[in-house]
């Protein structure tokens, strides 16, 4: 909330801006905390999903809620673990005012990650790009999106949600803001290797036809070899 007040004081955003929390079906007291914030200050609002539908669907739910509210010009998505620098929002909004419809938050380095996390994460980006997915290196889901982009994005009916690759497909002018990633405020990452692999699979199958070509080629080769024998 302090960040909204700061942006408002600089004349970058309206005082009507809001902080929207998305509760992804958590079983702890997260939703109670969100309701408490909303009861204390009108700048806080929240939505709660009936069950855990995954990080990407939670982000999408927040974006669509913001779009359908009909009151915002831009939406900035950010995780609540404290690792993404909220001060990067100032530059994001400035770049939007300069004409960018999408502004990607990009980590300048990954010093706070373990070697294994850094190795697998960077490998993920390289593999996705090699398979033809147009994603921004070291960008996760910290980004500014204009309502104009969200309106076009809402037309996508993907089953496997992979926002890092889907947003660039919409087009529109874009820019990048780099920032240093912080340590987590609490808890542990909910993106172990298994979830990263699942995310990679969703991204590959929804954004690239290269796996289909590879599989088709393998099937054709097997079929030919079977006939030869």
Located regions from the model:
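A conserved acidic beta->alpha catalytic loop
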Residues: 23-31, 82-83
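Short beta-strand/loop segment that forms part of the nucleotide-sugar
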Residues: 13-25, 48
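Short, acidic, metal-binding catalytic loop of nucleotide-sugar glycosyltransferases
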Residues: 2-15
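Catalytic beta-strand/loop signature of glycosyltransferases that borders the donor
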Residues: 175-181
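Alpha-helical segments in transporter systems
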Residues: 204, 209-221
């Amino acid at each position: 909330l302090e960040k909204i007040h700061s942006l408002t004081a600089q004349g970058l955003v309206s005082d009507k801006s809001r902080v929207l929390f998305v509760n992804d079906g958590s079983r702890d007291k997260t939703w109670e905390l969100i309701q408490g914030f909303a009861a204390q200050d009108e700048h806080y609002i929240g939505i709660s999903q009936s069950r855990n539908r995954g990080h990407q669907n939670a982000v999408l739910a927040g974006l669509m809620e913001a779009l359908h509210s009909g009151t915002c010009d831009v939406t900035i998505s950010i995780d609540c673990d404290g690792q993404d620098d909220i001060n990067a929002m100032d530059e994001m909004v400035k770049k939007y005012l300069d004409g960018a419809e999408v502004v990607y938050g990009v980590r300048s380095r990954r010093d706070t990650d373990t070697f294994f996390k850094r190795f697998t994460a960077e490998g993920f980006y390289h593999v996705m790009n090699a398979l033809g997915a147009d994603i921004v290196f070291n960008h996760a889901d910290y980004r500014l999106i204009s309502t104009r982009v969200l309106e076009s994005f809402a037309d996508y009916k993907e089953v496997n949600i992979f926002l890092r690759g889907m947003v660039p497909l919409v087009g529109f002018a874009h820019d990048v803001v780099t920032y240093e990633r912080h340590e987590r405020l609490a808890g542990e990452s909910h993106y172990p290797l298994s979830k990263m692999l699942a995310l990679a699979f969703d991204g590959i199958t929804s954004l690239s036809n290269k796996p289909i070509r590879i599989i088709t080629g393998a099937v054709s080769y097997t079929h030919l070899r079977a006939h030869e024998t």
